[in-house]
Amino acid sequence: MFRVNSIARQLGSFKSASKLSQQTRKMHVKPVKMRWLTGGVNYSYLLSTEDKTKSWLIDPAEPAEVFSALKTEELMSVEAVVNTHHHYDHSGGNGAVVSRLTELENADVQVISGSHNSPGTTQIPKHLQEYALGDLKIRCIRTPCHTQDSVCYYVSDPMSQEKAIFTGDTLFIAGCGRFFEGTGEEMDVALNRRILDGVGNSNWATTKVYPGHEYTKSNVKFVRHAVYKTAGENAALDKLEKFCNENDVTAGVFTLQDELEYNPFMRLDDPTVRDAVKDPQGSLTRAQVTDRLRTLKNKM
């Protein structure tokens, strides 16, 4: 009897320790502000494992600002420079960053991007291709529209259950990117099929969004002006608006589920959104609604 109870206590202790480990361990996301003094309000991100020995450096477009923000040991942990798309304000720093990492003996550093239009690209992932970064699982979700080589990176930590998605200029908080190389139909597919399906509906509420720019205040202003015009009409937007009034950084605060509740580009069948694009009868296609929303946003 003593032996059985002893074993039971040991098993209980093991389960408690395991649960505590899941609660205390975490993946790390370090946002790096770039071009904030010149109006670009870009983000680069250092995504790291729990022990910070392995990292991805996402969209390090401005090397001087990135090097200033990161410690030498953080740079030495970088296994890959990763781009969400080829625009210079996301991939323009690839060469200088790789050179610096090579000086730090990161001889095998890779450059992962959606096409060879990003300087120094060594790997081009296919849609839904997966990578491992230590214990982290990373799924590449190709989202052509803003550019045809746009890729979002969905990250999950199976130990802590933390989840994040790095969306570049495809999905912003309460908005989306311009359709420079695509159509409204492609953006609808990117946001409402590829991202949502790639993450999976059971994970939407726990997946934090890390966009390529801090455009949230501008996006909220548009949604309030053009769609949900009065407080109380959309509680999720009210909450986001209040947060924006009190904070400058929204990256990593809101989830995909939040986006589904206030982002008009992800609420194309909402009668209020239809009214905003002068389609009260709901006769327009989703692609047409997306195009009209983007046209309205571009005019602000």
Predicted regions span which residues?
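Accessory terminal helices/loops
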Residues: F2-Q22, R193-K208, Y215-M300
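Divalent metal-coordination and catalytic microenvironments
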Residues: L47, D59, H85, V97, ...
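Active-site HxH/HxHxD metal-binding segment of metal-dependent hydrolases
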Residues: S55, E62-R142, S156, Q161-K163
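Active-site metal-binding loops of divalent metal-dependent hydrolases
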Residues: P60-E62, H86, H116-N117, C145-T147, ...
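Active-site-flanking alpha-helical
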Residues: G92-G93, V97, C152-Y153, C176, ...
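Pocket-forming structural segment of enzyme catalytic cores
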Residues: D135-Y154, G168, R178-F179
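Charged helix-capping and loop-helix junction motifs
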Residues: G182-L191
